[in-house]
């Protein structure tokens, strides 16, 4: 196979994670996953931006993408996409946890972490499930995530979906 084919395939493989990660901002309010609890440092675990409702929407949208992908590949892509979406959201929550420990409020910016936390979470489960991803596919997805995150967040800001352009 060609490198171009491999890069296009990597987009398809990571599409559930991208969709899951991008669906969260559409939920404006909800029950915080951390139930408003603080960590031992007195700061919130994740903050109000990580909600059960957002998680459900992310899992639903990401898994729906997997159902569509499974029509072209194998039925196991439904399960893979559910787990990929879940781990992408876990990666996103770990990113929020790290930001709270650093004293960065919800909506605060940490270049790199904001764009790649969900990719790292999704990559973990994809590797554990033995989905074949090459190093250049992974690097391509990281670069794509970095630039797409910047662009889509700016558009979401212009559309008043997000409060900040990052």
UniProtKB/Swiss-Prot annotation:
Q: Name one Pfam family in it.
A: CarS-like
Task: Spell out the protein name for this chain.
Answer: CDP-archaeol synthase
Q: Which gene is transcribed and translated to give this protein?
A: carS
Its membrane topology is listed as: Multi-pass membrane protein
Function in brief = Catalyzes the formation of CDP-2,3-bis-(O-geranylgeranyl)-sn-glycerol (CDP-archaeol) from 2,3-bis-(O-geranylgeranyl)-sn-glycerol 1-phosphate (DGGGP) and CTP. This reaction is the third ether-bond-formation step in the biosynthesis of archaeal membrane lipids.
Q: Where would you say this protein principally sits, based on its record?
A: membrane
> Which pathway does the protein contribute to?
Membrane lipid metabolism; glycerophospholipid metabolism
NCBIfam families given in the database record:
PRK04032.1
Q: Tell me the organism's taxonomic lineage.
A: Archaea, Thermoproteota, Thermoprotei, Sulfolobales, Sulfolobaceae
Q: What's the top EC group for this one?
A: transferase
Q: What reactions does this protein catalyze?
A: 2,3-bis-O-(geranylgeranyl)-sn-glycerol 1-phosphate + CTP + H(+) = CDP-2,3-bis-O-(geranylgeranyl)-sn-glycerol + diphosphate
Family in the record: Belongs to the CDP-archaeol synthase family.
Molecular function, one GO term: CDP-2,3-bis-(O-geranylgeranyl)-sn-glycerol synthase activity
Query: Which InterPro entries does this UniProt record tie to the protein?
Result: CarS, CarS_archaea
Which segments cross the bilayer? 7-27, 55-75, 78-98, 116-136, 138-158
| Gene Ontology, cellular component aspect | plasma membrane
Report the locations given in the UniProt record.
Cell membrane
Q: Which cofactor does it need?
A: Mg(2+)
């Amino acid at each position: 196979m060609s490198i171009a084919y491999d890069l296009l395939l990597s987009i398809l493989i990571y599409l559930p994670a991208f969709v899951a990660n991008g669906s969260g901002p559409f939920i404006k309010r909800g029950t915080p996953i951390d139930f408003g609890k603080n960590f031992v440092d007195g700061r919130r675990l994740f903050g109000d931006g990580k909600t059960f409702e957002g998680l459900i929407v992310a899992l639903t949208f990401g898994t729906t993408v997997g159902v569509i992908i499974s029509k072209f590949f194998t039925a196991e892509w439904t399960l893979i996409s559910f787990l990929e979406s879940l781990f992408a959201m876990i990666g996103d929550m770990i990113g929020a946890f790290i930001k709270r420990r650093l004293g960065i409020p919800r909506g605060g910016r940490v270049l790199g972490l904001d764009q790649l936390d969900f990719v790292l979470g999704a990559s973990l489960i994809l590797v554990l499930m033995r989905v074949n991803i090459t190093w250049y596919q992974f690097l391509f997805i990281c670069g794509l995530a970095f630039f797409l995150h910047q662009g889509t967040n700016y558009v979401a800001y212009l559309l008043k979906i997000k409060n900040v352009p990052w």
